[in-house]
Amino acid sequence: MSVFNRNEDDGFSRDTPTIIAYPELPGTASGNAEYRLEESIGLAAAIGLDVIEARHYRVRSPRAATLLGGGQVDELAALVEEKGAELLIIDGALSPIQQRNLEDRVKAKVIDRTGLILEIFGERAATAEGRLQVELAHLDYQAGRLVRSWTHLERQRGGFGF
């Protein structure tokens, strides 16, 4: 279930080099940025990720495609390449489209705060019932993110909503 505990081709190990980005959106308290970054570093450390960089970004106008501005995404892409990061954690909520677009731009796996917390719960669930509940929550969370992930295999579309 966990994307971090698998050692498959698309999985991650506990020592995965990780970058954390906290987007400070309009209307949020600006004094919380350092606290949020420290908290996110602690959450990532809870599942053994190797946080190599943590940055704060002020977002004046959230973009529908990526949440962050174009220059900020370019900066993150350069940082991911420079540091050799395999995972980017956005300390906020991302839509499935934003997550996919960021992954395409930064060339690394991207998860948001909800995904990170689900991974922590999944790793720490002690009972079979707890593991099933976390897996159900994780599958529900992933459902919207899988909708357009196989579009490269489509040849034609038709009908209502297709």
Segments from the language model and where they lie:
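N-terminal accessory targeting/assembly segments
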Residues: M1-E119
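Extended, highly charged alpha-helical segments
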Residues: L116-F162
